[in-house]
Amino acid sequence: MKNKFDTLTVETGVKSKKKYPIYIGKAILNLLDKVIPRNVSVLIVIDSRIARLHRDKITRLIEFLTESRTVNQIIIPGEEDSKSLSVSESLYEKAASLNLDRSSWFIGIGGGVVGDLTGFVAATYMRGANLLHVPTTLLAQVDSSVGGKVAINQSGYKNLVGNFYQPKAVIIDTNFLDTLPIRELRAGLAEVFKYGILCDRELFLTVKSLFEDCEPLNNVSWERYSYLIHKSCEIKADIVSQDEIDTGIRMLLNLGHTFAHALEGATSYNYFKHGEAVMWGLAMSAELSYKLNKLTYKDYQAIAELPELTKVPEVPIQVKDPNIIEELLLRDKKKTGEELTVILPTSIGSAEICKCPATALIKVILES
């Protein structure tokens, strides 16, 4: 019996009209056989946690693919430190030693770190090999695996070296959520909140109800998670189809992220999960928008209460140093002079791109 799955299509590039599918379902790793051609070489980059917790599943997958392909694997820690030139170099060396060429396939099985790293290596190996994402965290499933952003960190800057490189497909198997810690589920839902604030009030309220019901997040049904994943990917795919390289409407997807990146940097990238920092970033964006008379008090309150409602970690005292915050904000890729491009909600369901002085953002962070 074949497992059921949903399919979305991402269209990229107004001129090139490239397309790729997103498959969403439970126990659907067999779809890799449908996507990857026969008689090609495959290098699978696997998050070490996934390799340990899903060893039998990964072993069966590799055996299945090996029947008609040459398959090798490399296991890396799914930590931010792995998004580095040194780890990238080890992947290049592995690929070269296996005589991989441009017809070969790189598959990333893991969270955002593995996806970013694998995508970066695939994009740059021989100027571009085939890429396929199998995201295993909720955050990667609803956000980072879709849209083609690939990058590594360098010189203390997050995602300093990167590009836009689209995968051939994204396969989202919700079975991986069964072993995901509650903290990771909570972090992933921050990005779903983001999509709701951007353009779908009903989605925002649906996610909020998960926390108001006080049901443990690891008891939520896979069907409910599949719905949230589908809605999130649908929204992101629509935005990416209009602006693949982040020069216009796609910038809206940065809602909460200017604040979040500063919070992550101020805590050395080892205190907050990315989604937890985004949760605070959403609240801070709402506060700034309310102070600029762009957001009603009712909607401001609904967004501002998210960190408390979702029980993400508090903002620690070291974030209260204005000099550190200013330095981090001025590293932002969306900076122009002393001004930052920041996304501000104008309601739960809409947002706009604004220019704000760094001092305005610093004040919001210090008062948090």
Swiss-Prot record:
- Per the UniProt entry, the Enzyme Commission number(s) are 4.2.3.4
Q: How is the cofactor bound?
A: Binds 1 divalent metal cation per subunit. Can use either Co(2+) or Zn(2+).
- GO biological process entries: amino acid biosynthetic process; aromatic amino acid family biosynthetic process; chorismate biosynthetic process
Q: Which cellular component appears as one GO term in the record?
A: cytoplasm
List residues binding NAD(+).
112-116, 136-137, 149, 158, 176-179
Q: Which cofactor does it need?
A: Co(2+); Zn(2+); NAD(+)
Any idea where this protein resides? Answer: Cytoplasm
Q: Which Pfam families match?
A: DHQ_synthase, DHQS_C
Which pathway does it serve? Metabolic intermediate biosynthesis; chorismate biosynthesis; chorismate from D-erythrose 4-phosphate and phosphoenolpyruvate: step 2/7
Give GO MF terms, alphabetically: 3-dehydroquinate synthase activity; metal ion binding; nucleotide binding
Please describe what this protein does. Catalyzes the conversion of 3-deoxy-D-arabino-heptulosonate 7-phosphate (DAHP) to dehydroquinate (DHQ).
PANTHER family under this entry?
3-DEHYDROQUINATE SYNTHASE, 3-DEHYDROQUINATE SYNTHASE, CHLOROPLASTIC
Q: Which family does it belong to?
A: Belongs to the sugar phosphate cyclases superfamily. Dehydroquinate synthase family.
Name listed for the protein in its UniProt record: 3-dehydroquinate synthase
Q: Which organism is it from?
A: Natranaerobius thermophilus (strain ATCC BAA-1301 / DSM 18059 / JW/NM-WN-LF)
Identify the gene encoding this protein: aroB
